[in-house]
From Swiss-Prot:
Residue ranges that the Swiss-Prot or TrEMBL entry lists as coiled coil: none
Naturally occurring in which organism (per UniProt): Streptococcus pneumoniae (strain Hungary19A-6)
Pfam families given in the database record: DHQ_synthase, DHQS_C
Gene symbol of the encoding locus: aroB
Name of the protein described by the UniProt record: 3-dehydroquinate synthase
Function: Catalyzes the conversion of 3-deoxy-D-arabino-heptulosonate 7-phosphate (DAHP) to dehydroquinate (DHQ).
Binding positions (Zn(2+)): 184, 246, 263
This protein's pathway: Metabolic intermediate biosynthesis; chorismate biosynthesis; chorismate from D-erythrose 4-phosphate and phosphoenolpyruvate: step 2/7
Length: 355
């Protein structure tokens, strides 16, 4: 299946197909002329797929080198970026060459940032290997790295030339790594896609059920992401809906220490906490918090952060990228399948941190 991201200045396709990673070279040859390519990946993904993708690209006529770094959210920083820059220079990459981001969200965000800044921008593509990356972070052009202050605080908007999604690679994920991706999938059902929510309701929450329906879950999620990105590429309007649960979720990730709480886990906890307070304030319908909580728990996602410290979470919120002055754009769900922006002051956000 192909999903077109029809952005006027940089349209591209998401290709979703079981087993398609084996044809990565043929796919890339349709996008780029043979040239130098650097695969950016982490050490874990490299051990599984780097050689397979490298050989496929070489068979298609590309000159290929591989750069891998230690896996983990804590490596998504400017220190790693500098190391990639140095590798690209040693390989002699020019503006006519490109980067293949092969990995999960950390790899995709970092490699995209490198591509968008090296020599003021070179071409790149995404081959996401985690569920979170396949349904969310590989699509839409947000790149970035973390700082000690906030997640993705340094970044760019830079669209890839294509996204290649192979649902079969999810079978090599650990249980926790697969389940955390369901945080984003559940979010899509809540903010835009009642049909997806109904599908999730019908699943029993097991790893087997996720893998069996992975292609459908990915397609639904990508369609929602496509709509938001095409209408609002630079995150000034409808695309903000994608941040449901992320305001508190990012604060949890930052205060826990990057890599301690996985992104989808933090999003799940953020959705539940925001919904609980918003429901109490009459801003979200009665019973929706229970529905979200039960859905997250069914798939094994955490719904409560055990190291909850209001002062530290609040400090992290002050660095939120969606803040405008002293106002945050909080995303709420007034009814299943729709979202809205509710501006709140930083002071009022303290209410949303009360357990």
């Amino acid at each position: 299946m192909k999903i077109r991201i029809d952005i006027p200045h940089h349209p591209y396709d998401i290709q979703i197909e079981k087993g398609c990673m084996a044809q990565a070279g043929q796919w890339l040859r349709e996008l780029w002329q043979p040239q130098k390519v650097v695969i950016v990946t982490d050490n874990h993904v490299a051990s599984l797929y780097a050689e397979k993708v490298k050989l496929s690209l070489e068979d298609a006529g590309f000159q290929v080198a591989v750069f891998d770094f230690l896996e983990g959210e804590e490596r998504k920083n400017l220190t790693t970026v500098q190391k990639v820059y140095e590798f690209l220079v040693k390989q002699g990459l020019t503006r006519s060459d490109g980067i293949v981001a092969l990995g999960g969200g950390v790899v995709g965000d970092l490699a995209g940032f490198v591509a968008s800044t090296y020599m003021r921008g070179i071409h790149f593509v995404q081959i996401p290997t985690s569920l979170t990356a396949q349904v969310d972070s590989s699509i839409g052009g947000k790149t970035g790295v973390n700082t000690p202050f906030a997640k993705n605080m340094v970044g760019t908007f830079a669209q890839p030339d294509g996204v290649l999604i192979d649902p079969l690679v999810l079978e090599t994920l650990g249980k926790r790594e697969l389940i955390e991706g369901m945080g984003e999938v559940i979010k899509y059902g809540l903010i835009e896609d009642p049909e997806l929510w109904a599908l999730l309701t019908g699943l029993n929450g097991s790893v087997e059920s996720i893998l069996e329906h992975a292609e459908t879950l990915i397609e639904h999620s990508c369609q929602v992401k496509r709509k938001m990105v095409v209408e609002d590429e630079l995150d000034n309007g409808i695309r903000l809906y994608l941040n449901f649960g992320h305001t508190i979720g990012h604060a949890i990730e930052a205060t826990a220490g990057y890599g301690k709480v996985m992104h989808g886990e933090a999003v799940a906890m953020g959705m539940v906490q925001i919904s609980k307070v918003a429901e109490e304030k009459g801003l979200m319908p009665a019973g929706i918090t229970q529905s979200i909580t039960e859905m997250c728990q069914k798939f094994g996602l955490p719904v409560d952060y055990e190291n909850w410290k209001v002062d530290k979470l609040y400090q992290a919120l002050t660095h939120d990228k969606k803040a405008r002055g002293n106002t945050l754009k909080l995303v709420l769900v007034p009814e299943l399948g729709s979202a809205t922006i509710h501006p709140v002051s930083l002071e009022e956000m303290k209410d949303y941190l009360v357990k």
